[in-house]
Regions:
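Core catalytic lobe of class I
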Residues: 2-102
């Protein structure tokens, strides 16, 4: 993995531009307010899969507020009932609910 410089800070990144780390840890490693849009599909905790464990929401929102610009956007994919939990966990940042019909 090559180190690249972003606003004077070194951020681990692959050649393809992908950050290879825990999402919360990754957001906190970025320069403050350096992200225009965060698009993520976090685990919902609605299955019995070992990896499907909901993120600690307080830590998640702290990381989002750190990395995303004040006028930036944070978009989360989620399914019911986790979408309600996620939205209610930070009403101050909740703006819209978009529904993707497949």
């Amino acid at each position: 993995m090559a180190d690249t410089s972003a606003l004077g800070q070194s951020v681990p990144k692959s050649q393809e531009g992908l950050f290879l780390m825990d999402g919360i840890e990754g957001l906190l490693s970025l320069p403050r307010h350096s992200v225009d849009m965060l698009l993520t599909d976090p685990p919902y905790g609605t299955t019995r899969n070992y990896w499907d464990v909901p993120l600690p929401l307080d830590a998640l929102w702290e990381a989002v507020r750190w990395a995303v610009k004040p006028n930036g956007a944070a978009l989360f994919f989620a399914q019911c009932p986790y979408d309600k939990v996620l939205g209610a966990s930070n009403l101050a940042m909740l703006r819209y609910e978009w529904i993707w019909y497949k």
